[in-house]
A protein has these predicted regions:
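Transmembrane alpha-helical segments and their membrane-water interfaces
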Residues: 67-74, 96-150, 356, 382
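A membrane-periplasm/extracellular boundary helix in multi-pass inner-membrane enzymes
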Residues: 147, 153-156, 245-285, 293-301
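Loop-to-helix entry and N-terminal half of a specific, functionally important transmembrane alpha helix
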Residues: 37-45, 85, 358-387
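Alpha-helical transmembrane segments of multi-pass inner-membrane proteins
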Residues: 132-162, 179-248, 352-357, 377-381
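A conserved mid-to-late transmembrane alpha helix and its immediate loop/hinge
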Residues: 179, 222, 296, 323-357, ...
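A juxtamembrane structural motif centered on a specific transmembrane helix
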Residues: 1-37, 209, 366, 401-419
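Long extracytoplasmic/lumenal interhelical loops at the membrane interface
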Residues: 274, 281-293, 297-301, 305-338
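Transmembrane alpha-helices of multi-pass inner-membrane enzymes
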Residues: 62-68, 372-419
Length: 419
């Protein structure tokens, strides 16, 4: 056990009976106290994802500076050579952003590089027990977020106002919950991820308290998702849940459970809050199609190379298109921003993790973790038809927390994958 009296961590450890009683009641406190000093500060960095993005980015920068000061950064940078295609893609993204004078795209490319550094270190420190602790904590944090979403929905608390960062950052979506995630659609996809995590933890634990908590957290996140009024998220969560069930169970139970998930999803989709927005679906689709047409028009101007991340926001005045941050489609925005060349590089960087997943699929005991990965990808694929919610600091971070565990879970014995 590491001695923490000379660190800030001692504040957390010194009186577990008085602090963290809720965490203790759901079995997290003992696991947190068992972390090494390095893992504890990594854990704190990870859970700060539930703070507003500007606070998270500040802590993220401090954490990377800490890695530099402690000498960890040198080893991490050397290890990046294991990801040549990804490095080349980030360099490519930076260069085309500079050529196009797309400075926001350059900032986004730099953030990609910093994420690569962080998640390389994350993979180095990750164990299966630590990964499960992270998932359980994210699920716990999502329950608190849903509680805040409820307060937002009933206007008991005011929404976060980002105008102090820029006059353009007004309070949008007055009647839709977004919690600390800047936009209801970003919070919506995070709810989807958390529901998938609840499915995974429920099917891989023998602990009764954790099963009960997963069921509770799943429904709480459904209500949080409802408060976002995110129409795209419900087809995504239905598809993700069905993929998870069929990957994991593979019998008639999966079919009937899928019918149940579909029914619950539809009931929420046409509930009072979302039903109001469903009534404006025709006009919203017309707006989406106009954005997609503008995105494709911009793509045709530079089909091979692209102009870097957030190309739509950078280039929309050229064709007198309406202002939007992106092309409201994962698929259109990707080819628009990175061109054919960059999209091919992205696809090539995905080959290694796909191969690892295919290897894992040969072991029947690893169906649940494969189901988690596939359900995440399904949520992104379906949600991405109408939006680009993954390309945000917090939603992208949570996605990578899960997907970057693929090399670890490939090595983990099936007997060690439950608790």
């Amino acid at each position: 056990m590491v001695e923490y009296k000379d660190s800030l961590a001692f504040i957390f450890w010194r009186n577990p009976e008085q602090k963290g009683s809720v965490l203790k009641s759901i079995g997290l406190l003992d696991k947190i106290r068992g972390l090494s000093k390095k893992d504890f500060f990594l854990y704190l960095m990870i859970i700060s994802i539930f703070l507003p993005f500007y606070l998270f980015l500040g802590l993220f920068a401090l954490y990377l500076i800490g890695l530099l000061v402690t000498g960890e950064m040198k080893g991490i940078i050397k290890g990046l050579a294991k990801h040549p295609v990804l490095l080349f893609f980030i360099a490519y993204s930076s260069i085309i952003s500079i050529v196009a004078k797309n400075w926001l795209g350059l900032v986004a490319s730099l953030l990609m590089f910093l994420f690569l550094i962080f998640f390389s270190f994350y993979q180095k420190r990750l164990t299966h027990a630590f990964f499960r602790l992270i998932l359980q904590t994210i699920l716990f944090g999502s329950v608190l977020s849903a509680a805040f979403a409820t307060l937002e929905h009933f206007q008991i608390v005011k929404k976060f106002n980002y105008a102090f960062l820029s006059p353009n950052m007004q309070v949008w979506h007055q009647n839709r919950a977004e919690v600390t995630f800047f936009n209801p659609n970003y919070y919506g996809i995070i709810c989807c991820f958390c529901i998938m995590i609840a499915f995974y933890l429920f099917t891989t634990t023998k602990l009764r308290w954790l099963k009960v908590f997963c069921v509770l957290a799943g429904f709480v996140n459904l209500f949080g998702l409802n408060f976002t009024q995110n129409r795209t998220a419900f087809p995504a969560i239905i598809a993700g849940a069905i993929i998870y069930l069929f990957t994991t169970i593979k019998n008639w139970k999966a079919f009937w459970l899928s019918i149940g998930v579909f029914a619950i999803g539809l009931s929420f989709l046409f509930s009072s809050d979302l039903g109001v927005r469903m009534g404006t679906l025709d006009s919203s689709m017309e707006e989406r199609i106009s954005i997609w047409d503008a995105g494709m028009a911009l793509f045709k101007q530079n089909p091979f190379w692209g102009e870097g991340p957030l190309t739509y926001m950078h280039s929309y005045p050229r064709i007198n298109a309406p202002y939007h941050e992106h092309a409201h489609s994962l698929y259109i925005d990707t080819i628009l921003s990175y061109g054919i060349v960059g999209t091919i590089l992205l696809a090539l960087s995905s080959v290694a993790p796909v191969r690892l997943m295919m290897d894992m699929s040969q072991e029947s005991g690893k169906r649940p973790i494969i189901g988690l990965y596939l359900s995440f990808l399904t949520v992104v694929a379906v949600h991405g038809i109408f939006d680009l919610a993954l390309f945000w600091i917090q939603s992208g971070f949570i996605f990578l927390l899960v997907m970057c565990s693929i090399p670890l879970e490939r090595r983990t014995l099936v007997s060690d994958m439950t608790d």
